[in-house]
Amino acid sequence: LKDRQPILRLAAPLALAMVLGMAVNASAGTPSGPRLTEVRSSRVLCRDDVDRARGVDVSVPVTPVSQIAHGRYAVPSTKPKTLVVFDHGYGHTSKSWVEHMKNAARDHGVAAVAVDYRGTHITPDANGDGLPEARGWRVMEGAEDSIAVAQRFLARCKSIKQVVIFGVSMGGNTSGLAVALAKDAKRADGSPLFDYWVDVEGAVNVIETYAGASALAPVNEFAAHAKADIEEEMGGTFDQKPDVYADHAVVNHIGDIKASGVKGVVVVHGLDDGLVPYNQAREMTGLLKEASIPTDMYTIGRKNDAPDKDTSLTGYAGGQLDPNYNSPLAGHASETSQTHIVMVTALDRLWTLIGGQAPGAGNEYIVDGPTGTYP
């Protein structure tokens, strides 16, 4: 979520309510959505000597007519072998990923793209952070958009052989659904569309997220917004549309993720996350392991010495006693950060993944800011 301190203070009790026992699971079939196979779009560059992110429009083949998704991308000066699709979180747009995309292209030689999910309500910057405001939980649309843009780059840039999808927070919901949908969107040679999925502090159980938002909505503006945005995506409340909610929960689609052919998953989550509870990462990791999908789980314990603000459960509790309290434990990072330990760990793991270090058979890692990673 965007770094807005008043919003963060309001958001922390939302996660606290979720941690205190609002998890819900339900069975579901394949996520609803079209068979996404072929995409027409505006021309994209495969190489660029200019250190910038360009705009991109992608046609998404949904019924009754195709729709356009807008986004931004950056490409290196040499032919890229890897594409990274970044899926943004709640309150963010593709603009939050400009610096990450430029770094990816310049420093790692990969093409990088982020899409503004169709249906998201985007308005000008209102808090002075230089980023537009955004409302909407358009995760199924974002999943379709992510598939469409990946297909577009593969069709245009023949040098790309590997595609990694990387989602943060709500983007974990989006990217997980994209991998599930991709079981029906494989490449022409039958290989998986997405080779790897990186799930960073991901909201992979939207039923749990909605339950927490609903509990706090009467007394919490942030929770009320989240509740309303989720209901808009689902077409009603959970009681009215339980099957739709189940269809949008990534944890209900392990079979589809397995069928997509994804080669492995990396899960990164702060132990003291105050927005998306750590239990969602544990649930996701357990299901992936049960399905024999190679998975690396990184639990972030203590923070590093970076000055980034985050949202943590202990930080919220301590802040009730001392407004200046700063928890030593890692909470929910802003996806724009290049120094918070959660984002540093996730991005470092992305680059090593691209470099050839694939996830293992259920590896567990503890990351401690002051002392390092174990084992």
Tell where the protein language model's regions lie, with residue ranges.
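Bacterial N-terminal signal peptides
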Residues: 11-21
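N-terminal cap/lid segment of alpha/beta-hydrolase-fold proteins
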Residues: 31-76
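Short substrate-entry loop that stabilizes the transition state in hydrolases
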Residues: 80, 86-124, 207
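Alpha/beta-hydrolase active-site loop
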Residues: 135-157
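Primarily recognizes the serine-hydrolase "nucleophile elbow" in alpha/beta-hydrolase
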Residues: 152-156, 160-217
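Mobile cap/lid helix-loop segments that gate and shape the active-site cleft of serine hydrolases
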Residues: 208-256
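Short beta-strand/loop motif that positions the catalytic acidic residue
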Residues: 261, 267-269, 273
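C-terminal catalytic histidine-bearing segment of alpha/beta-hydrolase fold enzymes
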Residues: 279-375
